[in-house]
Amino acid sequence: MGISKIDKMHSLSKNQQIIFDIINKSTEPLKAYTILFNVQKKGIKAPLQVYRALDKLVEIGKIHKIESRNAFIACHNSSCQVAKATAFSICEICEKVTEISSASLSKYLTSFKDKDGMKYSKYNLEFFGLCKKCR
């Protein structure tokens, strides 16, 4: 598999790559201090180092922050790395997080204005319910 245009534009620092690899290998969203615990043996000792890397990885679309869980997941949807609209379904029982990829939802959200005319620059929506396994 080749390197995407986004990957060429945003080469990751050593710390960013280490942190991304840990998040990418995880099967569930990870909190910052869980990430810190996992990267300490790789030379990243300070919480600030983790937070800086997380901020950059979110900014370039390599990971997403699940606001309600204050946790991070890797993005496996290359179109997210250029979009400002993200949406997730979160199971209320098992807490499985699934990224919702919908061109029509993204198009609607980027054109949405509220009744006061506020034009939003980015969205992070979270929908809660029961996954197929937990119903």
Regions found by a protein language model. Give the residues of each.
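Short acidic, hydrophobic short linear motifs in intrinsically disordered regions
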Residues: 29-39
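Key DNA-contact positions within bacterial/archaeal DNA-binding proteins
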Residues: 48
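Short, hydrophobic-biased segments on the C-terminal half of alpha helices
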Residues: 51-55
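Short, basic interhelical loop/turn and adjoining N-cap
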Residues: 41-45
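Short alpha-helical segments that sit at the start of domains
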Residues: 1-21
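A short, conserved structural fragment
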Residues: 58-66
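Short amphipathic alpha-helical elements of helix-turn-helix/winged-helix folds
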Residues: 18-26, 38, 60
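Non-DNA-binding regulatory cores of transcription-related proteins
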Residues: 65-69, 74-135
